[in-house]
Curated annotation (Swiss-Prot):
This is 4-hydroxy-tetrahydrodipicolinate reductase. (S)-2,3,4,5-tetrahydrodipicolinate binds at H159, G168, T169. It holds the Pfam family DapB_N. HAMAP family: DapB (MF_00102). It comes from Shewanella oneidensis (strain ATCC 700550 / JCM 31522 / CIP 106686 / LMG 19005 / NCIMB 14063 / MR-1).
Length: 270
């Protein structure tokens, strides 16, 4: 799309919400149309630009999407699974597109998203980073060449405030590898090890999780054999990389038909 796309950001007062506001401010083809916080938040009525540190934007934080129906084209949501489902329902009823960066959805919630996406365009990705999405392509190649001959482990680290584990990105890494190898991740995944576990089953894909300090996001996939190992690692040093990816997704999504899309499609990597 050549013109500006108007976005609304829910969870505007959180760490990611403020970063999204800042990112929107700096994007040539994006304009912030609305910023939303939960009812009762002390931030309602605060200027969104001042909250994000980019100066006054004359866009006050509101406590309901109903007040912003005519102010945006695409909703961007990095909140929580239950809230994201509510927001997507609202978008369907008001014919708005939606970018979902929330992680931690259960199976039933994913089914709800699939159903809603039949009625409105949705981009959902556990990680909006360009580098991470390129990493998934590299994992396909590594799995094709080395996967059946190596032990595969996925290690991820995030800040102390992250609520779900393993991260959505780590799970996606496992899904990419398992699919390439013709395995079912639900059956071959091992989440942490403790006690006498016995020898390692070569068919398993292990997951290890670190939660510490202010880690933005670090992910490593290890393909280990006797005598050598390959590690594919992505490290994020700023949330801005995720925010910029979300803006790119919003700009792309506004011209798409109803359906559920991912960042691979946004970036043309499929």
């Amino acid at each position: 799309m050549s013109g500006q796309v108007r976005v609304a950001i829910v969870g505007a007062g959180g760490r990611m919400g403020r970063t999204l506001i800042e990112s929107a401010y700096h994007q040539e083809h994006i304009r912030l149309g609305a910023a939303i916080e939960r009812p009762g938040s002390s931030l309602v009525g605060v200027d969104a630009g001042e909250l994000a540190g980019v100066g006054k934007l004359n866009i006050m934080i509101m406590d309901s999407l109903d007040y912003a129906t005519d102010d945006f084209d695409v909703l961007i949501d990095f909140t929580a699974p239950e809230a994201s489902i509510v927001h997507l329902d609202w978008c369907v009823r008001h014919k708005k597109a939606m970018v979902i960066g929330t992680t931690g959805f259960n199976h039933a919630q994913k089914e709800q998203i699939n159903a809603f996406a039949e009625q409105t365009p949705v981009v959902m990705a556990p990680n909006m980073s360009v580098g991470v999405n390129l990493m998934w392509k590299l994992l396909e190649l590594a799995a094709e060449v080395m996967g059946d001959y190596t032990d595969i482990e996925i290690i991820e680290g995030h800040h102390r405030y992250k609520k779900d584990a393993p991260s959505g990105t780590a799970l996606k890494m496992g899904e990419v590898i398992a699919k390439t190898l013709g395995r079912d991740l639900e059956k071959c995944a091992v989440y942490g090890r403790e006690g006498i576990t016995g020898e390692r089953d070569r068919e398993t894909i292990g997951f290890a999780t670190v939660r510490a300090g202010d880690l933005v996001g670090e992910h490593t996939a290890m393909f280990a054999d006797i005598g050598e190992r390959l590690e594919i690692t992505h490290k994020a040093s700023s949330r801005m990389t995720f925010a910029n990816g979300a803006m790119r997704a919003a700009h792309w999504l506004v011209e798409q038909k109803p359906g559920l899309y991912d960042m691979q499609q946004v970036l043309g990597l499929n």
